[in-house]
Design a protein with these regions (language model features):
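Glycine-rich, basic loop-to-helix element that forms the pyrophosphate-binding segment
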Residues: 42-61
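Non-catalytic, C-terminal membrane-associated alpha-helical segments of glycosyltransferases
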Residues: 239-363
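Conserved donor NDP-sugar-binding/catalytic core segment of glycosyltransferases
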Residues: 79-120
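Short beta-strand-to-loop acidic/aromatic patch adjacent to the donor-nucleotide binding site
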Residues: 64-77
């Protein structure tokens, strides 16, 4: 209901609103009917990318370069001026194919989640933010990024269709980074405008929701995320970088698996290794993905290197995070003593309120 209300309250309302219901078993379809929102019904196994493609296919033919697609998740509520601000950022920038908002926590609305996203060479999702960072305007502005989350992304429709939409091998997770990478390789750019704000619950990533998409082997979010991260790197990188990237992926997976075992999380450890194994036994998927991307590539895929964190940056960030969490474990504040997080509380709260085992959890 909050998402539907947020769409209806936009200062610049969308020209058309289409919802896609992928086999929900709650009252979503009834809610959409009551709100008079056109909606499509797909099977529960459909991924986000294919759902968007189905929705776009119902639109009249694209006749203008100024036609845009605004994507929202069912757990992402836009501020009432979000669409207006996103459109303002691209009004005089014809080379921009994608723009996204600042993303804050759903309940803790001072918790800064994203101002653009990237991917590290070991497959880690990279936001450039501290795990418990609060929004004080320190990252505000309009600037280029590798990509933005699909929760709130505004995409030029002509470019979306020219690139073939999202890769349907990425049912969930990392489809945003992959699409942004392909946008850059096609000679276009991606922006963030922090004047636009979205509040996101990240229900799937935080494991509050079962992952039922077809590609989700064993329905494990971490397994799907790691597999998709490796797929994005192997299908988008230049061919001569593939051996090094493969070694980095294997090394990082082994290190994280060992860390999970020390943290007594064997399920997550197995996810790390199974993710790579799933790609190893299906090299045809990587070959097909590389061939598909090559058709629309106008510049070297290394154009996005400037948006990727260096190894030094990653190492320093990991050490700082580890130090902060050890300090929190040894010297807890009064607010951290005896606190229990219920299912209804914000799972996106600062890391200091989470279990120390989150040291090894993938960054969101």
């Amino acid at each position: 209901p909050k998402v539907v209300a947020a769409i209806a309250s936009q200062s610049r309302p969308p020209d058309r609103t289409i919802a896609v219901d992928t086999g929900s078993i709650d009252g979503s379809a009834k809610l959409l009917t009551g709100a008079r929102i056109k909606h499509l019904s797909l099977s529960r196994g459909e991924g986000f990318g294919s759902a968007v493609t189905e929705a776009v296919a119902t639109l009249p033919p694209c006749e203008s370069e100024d036609e845009w697609i605004w994507l929202l998740h069912d757990d992402s509520a836009p501020d009432h001026r979000a669409l207006e601000k996103l459109l303002a950022a691209v009004s005089d920038r014809p080379n921009i194919a994608m723009v996204g908002p600042k993303i804050l926590g759903w309940n803790n609305r001072s918790h800064l989640l994203e101002v653009g996203i990237s991917i590290a060479r070991n497959g880690a999702r990279w936001t450039g933010l501290e795990a418990d960072e609060f929004d004080q305007g320190q990252h505000d502005g309009i600037f280029e990024v590798l990509s933005v989350s699909t929760a709130g992304a505004l995409i030029r429709r002509s470019v979306f269709e020219e690139l073939g939409g999202f890769d349907e091998k990425l049912d969930l997770f990392r489809d945003d980074v992959d699409f942004g990478w392909r946008v850059h390789a096609a000679g276009q750019s991606v922006l963030v405008n922090t004047d636009a704000v979205i509040y996101h619950a990240e229900a799937s990533a935080s494991e509050r929701r079962t992952v039922d998409v077809d590609e989700a082997f064993l329905h494990r979010p971490l397994l799907l995320d790691r597999r998709n991260a490796a797929y994005v790197l192997l299908t988008n990188s230049t061919w001569w970088m593939l051996p090094l990237i493969s070694l980095q992926l294997v090394g990082a997976a082994l290190l994280r698996a060992i860390g999970y075992l020390f943290a007594k999380l064997p399920g997550y450890a197995s996810d790390e290794l199974l993710a790579l194994f799933r790609l190893i036994i299906r090299p045809d998927q990587v070959r097909a993905g590389r061939k598909w991307r090559k058709a629309d590539r106008l510049v070297s895929p290394r154009i996005v290197t400037r948006f990727m964190p260096s190894r030094v940056t990653q190492f320093r960030s990991a050490l700082e995070s580890l130090f902060d969490r050890i300090q929190s474990a040894l010297f807890p504040t009064q607010s951290e003593i005896g606190n229990e997080i219920s299912e209804d509380e914000d799972l996106l709260a600062p890391v200091s309120q989470r279990d120390w085992k989150m040291i090894f959890k993938r960054p969101e």
